[in-house]
Amino acid sequence: GLFGKILGVGKKVLCGLSGMC
């Protein structure tokens, strides 16, 4: 649902910022 989509985007942002992808 919407919450899952927001969580997914948040994880992508954190992954990109931290460089731990």
Swiss-Prot record:
Main location as per UniProt: secreted
Gene Ontology terms: cellular component: extracellular region
Domain of life of the organism encoding this protein: Eukaryota
Localization terms from the record: Secreted
Keyword annotations from UniProtKB, A to Z: Antibiotic, Antimicrobial, Cytolysis, Fungicide, Hemolysis, Secreted
Tissue occurrence: Expressed by the skin glands.
GO biological process, one term: defense response to fungus
Keyword ATP-binding: no
Disulphide bonds in the chain: none
UniProt function note: Antimicrobial peptide active against the Gram-positive bacterium S.aureus (MIC=12.5 uM) and against the Gram-negative bacteria E.coli (MIC=3 uM). Has antifungal activity against C.albicans (MIC=50 uM). Has some hemolytic activity against human erythrocytes (LC(50)=40 uM).
Protein family membership: Belongs to the frog skin active peptide (FSAP) family. Brevinin subfamily.
Protein name, as recorded: Nigrocin-2GRb
